[in-house]
């Protein structure tokens, strides 16, 4: 079974084709980073217009890459939420229209389920059950996962997501959008002993997160210590260490609560090398395993949507005629299969 996946939830246009027997056949991605860089963040209207321009050409490119024709596709999966409503509507409209024209099922996919299942594309996929750390620009959540659609929210950010905090702090440090990866690179030259940032909400029970205060702490530290290159690197290091340590503390608590031996991390921030090393050490000490996707499948992409769509389609999921998206969509509302 071959499924075409379309991702347009924010500022990346992703299209991929996944075959349930042979794996990923094609993967095309267009990033809008340069488009939004001058504005310091994603402009929803510009994002939607660029998706309109890029989605169909990327679908054509994916079919060429896979050496397939329209008649070879068995289903069309598209991101139906959460995300920017205009951007979502572009992918949903194109996906639903193609499914109707090709007389194949259309499968609406939850963006975060796509991220959660992305490690399944690797050679050593995780087995159920596991704790999932979903950490991106829009979400920071800990999820108990016992099967497809069997998701229980353990904790989440009460304000900024970790990725959002990275980008905002990077902006304070004078880095261009998107600043998170640049902040991490800057942190490599930082002195880990110079500044100590707080580990928010780790001094109390619970699995929720809060990262907005770290941005404020960074701003105050910058004002108090100047803005030379080394100071900025030291602040970046202290900030990254605080975020990574906070995530690790909460992951340990979630593993203790569930008793699971496997940890999956997914989302854009899961590509962070410091976080990968830290959680790898955590799981090694516990005699468990940590799983994550290759870096290109951590950020938004069509491959994760095609895969998640293939899993749902194999269990009978499809949408009737009509287009609907959900800018807000709790993961726990998804049906189990």
From Swiss-Prot:
Catalyzed chemical reaction(s): L-threonylcarbamoyladenylate + adenosine(37) in tRNA = N(6)-L-threonylcarbamoyladenosine(37) in tRNA + AMP + H(+)
Main localisation: cytoplasm
Cofactor note: Binds 1 Fe(2+) ion per subunit.
CDD domains recorded: ASKHA_NBD_TsaD_bac
GO molecular function, one term: N(6)-L-threonylcarbamoyladenine synthase activity
The EC number(s) this enzyme carries: 2.3.1.234
Top-level taxonomic group: Bacteria
HAMAP family tied to this protein: TsaD
Name of the molecule in the record: tRNA N6-adenosine threonylcarbamoyltransferase
């Amino acid at each position: 079974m071959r499924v075409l996946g379309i991702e347009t939830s924010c500022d990346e246009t992703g299209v991929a084709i996944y075959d349930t027997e042979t794996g990923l056949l094609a993967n095309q991605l267009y990033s809008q980073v340069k488009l939004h860089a001058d504005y310091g963040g994603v402009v929803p209207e510009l994002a939607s217009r660029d998706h309109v321009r890029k989605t169909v050409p990327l679908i054509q490119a994916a079919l060429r890459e896979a050496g397939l024709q329209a008649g070879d596709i068995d289903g069309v999966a598209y991101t139906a939420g959460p995300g920017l409503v205009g951007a979502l509507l572009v992918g949903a409209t194109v996906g639903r229209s193609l499914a109707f024209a090709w007389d194949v099922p259309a499968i609406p996919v939850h963006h975060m389920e796509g991220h959660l299942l992305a490690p399944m594309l690797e050679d050593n996929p995780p087995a159920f059950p596991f704790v999932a750390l979903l950490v991106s620009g829009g979400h920071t959540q800990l999820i108990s996962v016992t099967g497809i659609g069997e998701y229980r929210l353990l904790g989440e950010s009460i304000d900024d997501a970790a990725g959002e905090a990275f980008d905002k702090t990077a902006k304070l440090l004078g880095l261009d959008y998107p600043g998170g990866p640049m902040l991490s690179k800057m942190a490599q030259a930082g002195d880990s002993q110079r500044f100590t940032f707080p580990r928010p909400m780790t001094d109390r029970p619970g699995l929720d997160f809060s990262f907005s205060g770290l941005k404020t702490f960074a701003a105050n530290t910058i004002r108090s210590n100047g803005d030379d290159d080394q100071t900025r690197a030291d602040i970046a290091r202290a900030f990254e260490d605080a975020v990574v340590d906070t995530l690790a503390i909460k992951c340990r608590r979630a593993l203790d609560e569930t008793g699971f031996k496997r940890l999956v991390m997914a989302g854009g921030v899961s590509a962070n090398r410091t976080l990968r090393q830290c959680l790898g050490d955590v799981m090694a000490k516990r005699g468990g395993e940590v799983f994550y996707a290759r870096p290109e499948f951590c950020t938004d992409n069509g491959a994760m949507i095609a895969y998640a769509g293939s899993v749902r389609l194999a269990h009978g999921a499809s949408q009737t005629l009509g287009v609907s998206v959900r800018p807000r969509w709790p993961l726990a509302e998804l049906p189990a299969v």
